[in-house]
Swiss-Prot record:
It comes from Methanosphaera stadtmanae (strain ATCC 43021 / DSM 3091 / JCM 11832 / MCB-3). GO terms for molecular function: 3-phosphoshikimate 1-carboxyvinyltransferase activity. Phosphoenolpyruvate binds at residues 21, 92, 122, 169, 346, 386. The gene is aroA. PANTHER family: AROM/DEHYDROQUINATE SYNTHASE, PENTAFUNCTIONAL AROM POLYPEPTIDE. This is 3-phosphoshikimate 1-carboxyvinyltransferase.
Amino acid sequence: MDLQVEKINKISGVIKAPASKSYSHRAFIAAALAEGQSILRDPLYSADTIATLEACEQLGALFQRYPDKCIVQGTAGYIRTPENIIDVKNSGTSVRILSSVAAIAPRANYTIFTGDESLRKRPMQDLIDALENLGVQISSSQSNGTPPIIVKGGFEGGQTDIKGDVSSQFISSIIMAAPYSKKPVTLNVKGTFVSKPYVNMTLSVISKFGIDFEYDTTNIPEYSSYYIEPQKYEATDYTIEGDYSSASYILAAAAMLPSNLTVKNLYKDSMQGDKIIIDIIKKMGAEVTVDDDQIHIESDGNLKAFDINLEDAPDLLPTISILMAQAEGVSKITGVEHARFKETDRVHNCAVELENVGVDVEELQDGLIIKGNPTGGYVDSHMDHRMVMAFYVLGLKIGNIIIKDASCYDISFPNFLEVMHTISEE
C-alpha cells in the first residue's frame, strides 16, 4: 500500500511505548528452551516476533497467546524435528538465533530455515563458520553464506571465534544455544564489536532464565570472551520492557514539531543501545525529562545540526537521518557500515530517499552527511519497516510525502499509525 502523510501542527498527549521487539524475541526463545512453564508479560506480537514464536512452536514449545501475556511450556532443551521447513519471513533475528538453537536437537535431525527474498540475502557465513568449530553441521543451501540454512542436530561445544563487526546477532545466537551443548562453550569475539548492547540484552534475558556465564572484557574493543557451561534454562515470570527503537519515531516526531508529550514504559536503566535517542534529541534542542519509567519531551520544533556515531545503535539510522534532514546546518552520522546488512542496505537507501525528498546528502562508507531543508516527494520504503516509520515522521513535519509499500511497519510496530494518530494535532 502507498501511504500519503499529511502535515500536522503539534504532538501532544500521554502514550505507552510498545514492548521491545529485541527482548520479545529473546524471551520467546529462552522460554521455549526452559524446563517448565514460563509467563511472559506484555510481549510484542509483531510480524518478526511471531515468526520467532511460531518457529519455536515447530521446534516443540507450546505457546498460549493473550493480549497482555504469553504462557510458554518449554522443551527443557529437547528440541523436536520440525515437520516442515521453518519460514521466518523477514526476521533476521529469528533465523540467526534459531540456527544455533536447532543444533541442540538430536544428532539425526535436520532443520531447514528460509524466509522472504530480503532475508535470503542476509549474511550468515560468519555464524556458520563459528558453529562448525563447535561441532555443528550447518550449511547454506546455495553455498553462498545466506539462507536457506540447513542445520543437523548435534552441538558438541568447545571454543570458537567470531568477528564482531557484522552482526551482534551471531554472538547472541551462540550464547543462547550454548547452555545445551555437550561441553562448555568459549566464544571469543574478535575485532570491532558493533551493536554490543544487543548482546548485553541477551545476557540479561538468559540470566533471568537461570543461566550462569562468565564474561572477560580485558582488552575491549579488541577482544571479548564468553564462557558458558552445560546447564538448563529455568522457567520464570518475565516482564518485557518498552522498546526504545520503536519509541524513537514517537520521540523524533515530538522533537521536530511543537510538542508536549509523555511516553510511558521506557526505563531509565534500560540496556537498550537505542536509548541514546534521548541524548540525541536533547543535543538537537528538545527539552527532555527522564523518570524511572517514562520520558517527557517538550520542543518548539527547531532543531540544531549534530554529529553522532551510531555504531552501537544502527537501527536508529533512519530516525536520526530524518531528524538531521529537518535540522538547521550540516549533520554527520558515522559508525553504521554494518547497517548495510540489515533488511536492506540502510545507509544507501537512506541517502537515496533523503535525496528524493529534496535533502542534500552525501553517502559515506559508514554513514551520511546531511544538510537539511526537505521539500517532500515520493519515497520507496524498500520494504523496510524502519524506513516507513522514519519518513512518516518527516511527513508529519513537512507534508507532501507519499511512501511506497508502507504496510511493512507491522514487522516491529503493528499499531504504529494508530499511535501516531493519537498524539497528532492538526
